[in-house]
UniProtKB/Swiss-Prot annotation:
Main location: mitochondrion
Annotated keywords: Membrane, Mitochondrion, Mitochondrion inner membrane
Name of the protein this chain belongs to: Protein ups1 homolog
Domain of life: Eukaryota
Membrane topology classification: Peripheral membrane protein
Subcellular location: Mitochondrion inner membrane; Mitochondrion intermembrane space
PRELI/MSF1 domain residues: 2-171
Any single GO BP term: intermembrane phospholipid transfer
């Protein structure tokens, strides 16, 4: 069973600024649950695209029923991104490495320059929540995770904008 969340957001910053801020968005006051972000691999290919693979460690509170299942409040996330300056496109994919017997969350994001205003960036996000659990428990896990994801998505966008203001648009 799979639950899906989609989101489209317009950021008030150019694609160049957003793609630069993307790589340095942690830490920020809107992502206190991100304990660490470590680069595992980074390279530029022959066409000038920047590939990055990072390990994120996130920590947070779980509902009582989930803490009984997991007995841990940390999660390890793999993030892969490709920044293509020639297309002015940033694509990212993130997914959890642990707790996959309970829930797998896969998030895809695409950042492109707005065709109407070059000082804005469009972000399309699709997140998939897949749980192998049965007897209604999988549905419950997906529903909770989907709700939390939707709540944290706006916080994530605010964090990125915070980094943009602090590092790329100083007053």
């Amino acid at each position: 069973m799979t639950a899906i969340c989609t989101d489209k957001t317009e950021l008030n910053a150019s694609w160049n600024t957003v793609s630069s801020a993307w790589l340095t968005r942690y830490p920020n006051p809107y992502s206190l649950h991100v304990v660490s972000a470590d680069v595992l691999e980074r390279y530029v290919d022959d066409e000038g695209r920047l590939y990055t693979e990072r390990l994120l460690v996130k920590q947070g509170r779980l509902p009582r029923w989930a803490s009984d299942l997991l007995n841990v409040n940390k999660s390890y996330i793999l993030e892969r991104s490709v920044i293509d300056p020639s297309k002015q496109e940033l694509k990212s994919e993130t997914f959890n490495l642990d707790h996959v017997k309970i829930l797998r969350v896969i998030e895809y994001s695409r950042f492109i320059q707005s065709s109407e205003n070059c000082s804005k960036t469009i972000v399309d996000t699709i997140a998939k929540f897949v749980s192998p659990l049965r007897f209604g428990l999988g549905r419950r896990v997906q529903k909770y995770s989907l709700k939390r994801f939707q709540e944290q998505l706006s916080s994530s966008r605010r964090g990125l904008l915070y980094v943009i203001q602090q590092k790329f648009q100083p007053s």
